[in-house]
Amino acid sequence: MMLLCACENYLDLTPKGATLLDNLTEIEYLLNGNYTNSAYEFEDLYVMTNDSYGKMANPSTVLANNIGLEYALMAYDESVDRYVYTNSNPHYSGYYSNINSMNILLARLDDLSGDIALKASLAAEAKILRAYWHYLLVNIFAAQYDAATADAQGGIPYVTDMDLEKVNEKLTLAEVYRLLLEDCSEKTINNLPDKAVNILRPGKAMGYALRAKIHLQMKNYILQQFLFEFC
């Protein structure tokens, strides 16, 4: 009997340095990005805004090859199916890893005790960050939004749960952008802190800025201009 009790005591111990995500303090850590993750290497994406060529090869070489994701981004070639390059791109897996962290937070939050306002704020931050990573994914690995073709154009999977066994189907562009706006709803933004907790976390300014960027991609220019005034 004494041996049994001793075993139970050892089983109840939490390993040093580990977290069970069983309280608000611990689960809040999921909102802080890991900058060693390849998902945060944005250099190659600067070409999309004509800022720089990042770590890419010589522009003449990339454009001459006429294939690959780097070529598609640099040449703004909409005829390239960017989705076929997802398996070999570290951004793709890295972004979905970050999305999974947000989904874990959202799935666990309701079961935790604590301040209701804080829980609402954490949920809002997770939804905004989830939308942010999906926004990057759809702009890198799918065609640009066109209202005339969005219902038929392939987009990306939009993952809103942490079921790792489920195969997430690729949605249409229209469905992806609908979910982006759903995650960036006015209710969600209102629950964000007026000022971000730290530079890794979203506040109201980021919420409005992201929603404005989504409307900009959708060519809803009046709404985009209105939202940018809140940033």
Model regions: which residues?
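Membrane-proximal, proline-rich intrinsically disordered regions
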Residues: C7-G54
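Conserved, well-structured interaction surfaces
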Residues: G68-F141, L171, I189-V197
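Inward-facing hydrophobic residues that define packing positions of alpha-helical scaffold repeats
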Residues: I99-M102, Y177, C184-S185, F228
